[in-house]
Amino acid sequence: VDSQGQNITLMDFDQMIDGITETDELELQDTIIEKSVTFKNKTFKLPAILNSLPLGKTAQFGKLARAAFQLNENEIHTNLLHIEPGGGVPKHTHKGFELTVLLAGSFHDSHGKYVKGDFIMLDGSNVHQPTSQNGCLCYTVANDALHFTEGLNKLLNPIGSFIY
């Protein structure tokens, strides 16, 4: 029964639904704003999922650059890591875990070669020295500092938690 006391039949209901669904096609607009990041004059388009994350200033260390996402994650740190062509990270292990998604380029270490789209999970049982012949951009998530295992870089270990 409708608001005027009239009986609504099944046919009336079907006609009503048909009337609602028989509209012109709607044109959907993409509202995704593309975001990019630049390291040493090389610009990378970020995946859409990262577009809304606030990115801090870039810190440059030789052929390495890092920009931290400002996510207030306590002990978890999320970064973009750029390795320039011919660059690498000194030999190290991890005090906690490190998750890496390779966003662009490639790198290799003692475990193998990694290319765009690869997902790598490492912890304190892994020692490696990532190097990139042609450069790469990585999305990394870690819960503690690196622990350098060779050379002068070992001098950074006592202050590692302040710089990771």
Where are these regions (language model features)?
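Positively biased amphipathic helices and basic secretion/translocation or surface-docking motifs
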Residues: 1-54
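Short histidine-centered beta-strand/loop micro-motifs
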Residues: 70, 80-81, 90-94, 111, ...
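Short, loop-centered acidic/histidine patches that primarily coordinate divalent metals
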Residues: 104-105, 119, 123-125, 141-144
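Short acidic-glycine-tyrosine-enriched beta hairpin
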Residues: 109-132
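Ligand-binding loop in jelly-roll beta-barrel domains
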Residues: 126-148
